[in-house]
Amino acid sequence: MLKVRINDRELEAKAGDALRDVLLASDILFDFPCGGGGSCGQCTVEVEPASSVEGPLHHGLPLACQAVLRADCSVFLRVQADAWVNAAETGEVEIDEADRLVRALTLTLVPPSLEDQRSDWTRLSEALTAAGLESENPDSALLGDLAAGLRSDDWTAHLLVEGKSLLGFSPRGKSCYGFAIDLGTTTVDVALYDLETGRQAGRRTLFNRQVAYGADVISRAAAFRRDHSAVRTAASSTIAEAAEALLEEAQVATASVVRTVVVGNPIMLHILLGLDPFQLTQAPYIPLITDPVRRPPAEFGFSFQGKGVVETLPLISAFVGADTVGVIVALGLGAETRTSLALDVGTNGEIVLARGGQLSATSAAAGPAFEGAQISCGSRAITGAITHVTVEPENVTCRVIGGGPGRSICGTALIMAVAGMLDRGVIDETGRIVEAEEVGSQALRERLFEREGLLAFALTEDRSVFITQKDVRELQLAKAAIRTAIESLMAETGTAWSQIERVHLAGNFGAGMSVSSEIRIGLLPPTPLERVDTVGNAALRGAALVLLSRSGREEACRAARLCRYVELAGRPEFQQSFADALLFSWGAGV
């Protein structure tokens, strides 16, 4: 056996083992943006001695996804995904008592006798029916609690009811809790709520462990076909890690957790449900199911929930999922009287237009550039990542997570840097990084250098973090996809930009973004800043409203049913609109 030291961990492996397999088997979270294909060059590692691994090199370093172990070695993961990411906002969800979805109910039953030998379940079922509630077949968790639950208080049953459905027996004297979960492609956001008060008892955001199988949903779908159990477990274990930490922190027992609501894009939810999402990746792009799904927690492997149900929100289409439904619910777009646009930018961009009581939605495959993937020095928002950049005439200043030296650049910083480079004449409107003699500032000219035949612009003094011409092109492709989707949706609904009264920027990415920078690169048209608001993770808040309230659940189902999906594929004007959108300006006619 070989001895392999990875950062601070000592592991064993066999000669000929792939380093990527060792990382996965050891539960070490590490990004493989292209899914292990060796094409993105972003999983480079330092190995000592260098001769202990075989495989292709990128900038003189082995790729973790291609490296094969041959001898004892030490491996240093230069950019390792942080296990925990701080969540931006917390807070309660105000729910009227009459609108509360989960409530306590007490039923007094007639005790059994030699003359009345009905089973425990028959006895409870008939009492539920008499109270106007449903009495479906009980699951194993409810049956396990049945005998003690009925006899502990002399046949007075203390129950928890969700609408007209029985969730289980109430933990007497204790609050009952539930989880709202946003299962994202990149991150998983989990919040714990008191179901009676709407109080948020805690929140955690983690990187989705599926990042080891690729940065985008197409990579995940392909990986699911190769190893469906591992890919599904990567998602469920990420959720469980966050949920268990929240329960421990809030000192809440698993028996008190009775309800969980999950939102996510269609491929993420298909995978969580154990359904093959492959048909979502091929025309005509038909999901297996768009309805809400309700299952016992055991079917998801959710050991952090003792009883009750796990529910997913409905989908709108193969490309607009339950996360978008959550955004609609959270922002009240279904009842919006103003003409409003909601935009969730990420690897997959979703756009919703509310106008005249009608909802229309579309999506754009922006790719992973907004998340820092496929960028030379790109990364997620992890320790050492540059999040904000200001390009001044004589200097470049950077804000770094953790406060140390910058080691990488995340999507928000990429947009801000390119916007600043445009303002200072380092990039022209076509996206070309200009020659040094075309830049007016001597300090900025000195930041231009050639790397592998392409011009690059240094963000750090030592040139260790930089933006290349290829990186600028990647950003252009990503923002053009979003912009074209916005324009197409507005054209389809006959809406001019001047009619848009409110723009909502949703998602963790939108929360950290400079709106003026988005306008400068042409992602949004010139817009008064007071018309734009960043709403954070609205999908998670929508999940919380469905978790806690009858009206939230009803609105989610109504929104999914009434929202019209606008398909962009095959439109004759799409390619020309996309080409125009590559420019770093919005142009006329909006």
Show where each model-derived region lies.
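Local cysteine-cluster metal-coordination motifs and their immediate loop/turn environment
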Residues: L29-A50, P56-A71
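A short acidic Gly-Thr/Ser loop motif
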Residues: G36-G38, I181-T187, Y193-E196, N265, ...
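Nucleotide/phosphate-binding catalytic cleft detector across ATP-hydrolyzing
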Residues: H59-A180, T185, V231-S236, A240-T254, ...
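Glycine-rich phosphate-binding loop of actin/hexokinase-like ATP-binding domains
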Residues: G184-T185, V190-D216, F278-P292, G326-V329, ...
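N-terminal phosphate-binding loop and adjacent alpha-helix
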Residues: R209-E248, Q374, A385-T390, E474-L477, ...
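A short helix-loop
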Residues: V352-R355, R380-A443, A556-L568
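Catalytic phosphate/nucleotide-handling subdomain of diverse soluble enzymes
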Residues: R355, A491, T495-A560
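A contiguous, well-structured pocket-lining segment that forms one wall/lid of small-molecule binding clefts
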Residues: L422-T493
